[in-house]
């Protein structure tokens, strides 16, 4: 098991949450709901587009299709037209309707709070399953994507031997140890990770002098 400095982890948690409360994108509607269907819809709409683009169609989408049953019986051309501003609307509409039909047929329209069962849904992998568990089921799951991985690598020196670190079970295990156990704090921590990586700890030319983690960051202090 990888050794992680407890003091550094505590500082990482505290500062990320404090930073998120001031600078994070707390107004995003899917961050203010515990409805698993709304969270799944957001996850599918957010693929290959930006949060600000999704905001424009998200609430109208949920107004028309407030549950899996409503979307399962929808016409694909109507769904495509609604989400056209996001791009790849043919693929996106097909996958969303397929997801809704599967939830209706398999679970009677109820979305399970089980990672194994969530991952059986079409188009749902570890990350989206974790999103649902975190936001709808009160489970302190990590949202391990390239953004969180970048911060783990830079701040804590956590490295994966795999070419695709987000598929590395060891990275998932490490991330779970870092996420706070309190469900509300776990959400703030994860969202703080995503926002900090997008705004400050960017892949190229990170704004290290503006980062709340710079004095505990291995990357910054070894640069």
From Swiss-Prot:
Matching InterPro entries: DNA_glycosylase, Endonuclease3_FeS-loop_motif, Endouclease-III_FeS-bd_BS, HhH-GPD_domain, HhH_base_excis_C, MIG/MutY
Alphabetical keyword list: DNA damage, DNA repair, Glycosidase, Hydrolase, Iron, Iron-sulfur, Metal-binding
Description of how activity is regulated: Thymine cleavage is completely inhibited by Ni(2+), Co(2+), Zn(2+), Cu(2+) and Mn(2+). Activity is not affected by Mg(2+) and Ca(2+).
EC nos: 3.2.2.29
A Pfam family matched in the record: HhH-GPD
Reactions performed catalytically: Hydrolyzes mismatched double-stranded DNA and polynucleotides, releasing free thymine
Cofactor(s) the record lists: [4Fe-4S] cluster
Residues noted as binding [4Fe-4S] cluster in the record, renumbered to the chain: 201, 208, 211, 217
GO biological process, one term: mismatch repair
Record's cofactor remark: Binds 1 [4Fe-4S] cluster. The cluster has a structural role.
Activity sensitivity to pH: Optimum pH is 8.5.
UniProt GO molecular function: 4 iron, 4 sulfur cluster binding; 8-oxo-7,8-dihydroguanine DNA N-glycosylase activity; adenine/guanine mispair binding; G/T mismatch-specific thymine-DNA glycosylase activity; metal ion binding; oxidized purine DNA binding; purine-specific mismatch base pair DNA N-glycosylase activity
Temperature remarks: Optimum temperature is 65-70 degrees Celsius.
UniProt cross-references to PANTHER family, sorted A to Z: ADENINE DNA GLYCOSYLASE
Family: Belongs to the Nth/MutY family.
Record's function text: DNA glycosylase that excises thymine from T/G mismatches. Also has a weak DNA glycosylase activity on uracil paired with various bases.
Protein's name according to its UniProt entry: Thymine-DNA glycosylase
The organism of origin for this protein: Aeropyrum pernix (strain ATCC 700893 / DSM 11879 / JCM 9820 / NBRC 100138 / K1)
């Amino acid at each position: 098991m990888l050794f992680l400095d407890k003091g550094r982890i505590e500082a990482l948690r505290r500062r990320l949450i404090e930073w998120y409360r001031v600078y994070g994108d707390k107004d995003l509607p899917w961050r203010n709901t515990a409805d698993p269907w709304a969270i799944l819809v957001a996850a599918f709409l957010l693929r290959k587009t930006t949060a600000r683009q999704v905001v424009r169609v998200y609430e109208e989408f949920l107004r028309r299709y407030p549950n899996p049953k409503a979307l399962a019986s929808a016409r694909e051309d109507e769904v495509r037209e609604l989400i056209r501003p996001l791009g790849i609307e043919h693929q996106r509409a097909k996958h969303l309707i397929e997801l809704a039909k599967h939830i209706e047929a398999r679970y009677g329209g109820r979305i399970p709070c089980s990672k194994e069962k969530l991952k059986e849904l079409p188009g749902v992998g570890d990350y989206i399953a974790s999103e649902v568990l975190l936001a709808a089921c009160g489970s302190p799951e990590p949202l391990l994507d390239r953004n969180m991985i970048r911060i783990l690598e830079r701040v804590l020196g956590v490295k994966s031997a795999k070419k695709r670190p987000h598929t590395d079970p060891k990275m998932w295990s490490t991330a779970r140890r870092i996420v706070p156990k309190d469900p509300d704090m776990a959400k703030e921590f994860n969202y703080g990770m995503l926002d900090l990586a997008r705004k400050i700890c960017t892949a190229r030319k990170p704004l290290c002098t503006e980062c709340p983690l710079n004095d505990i960051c291995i990357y910054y202090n070894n640069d």
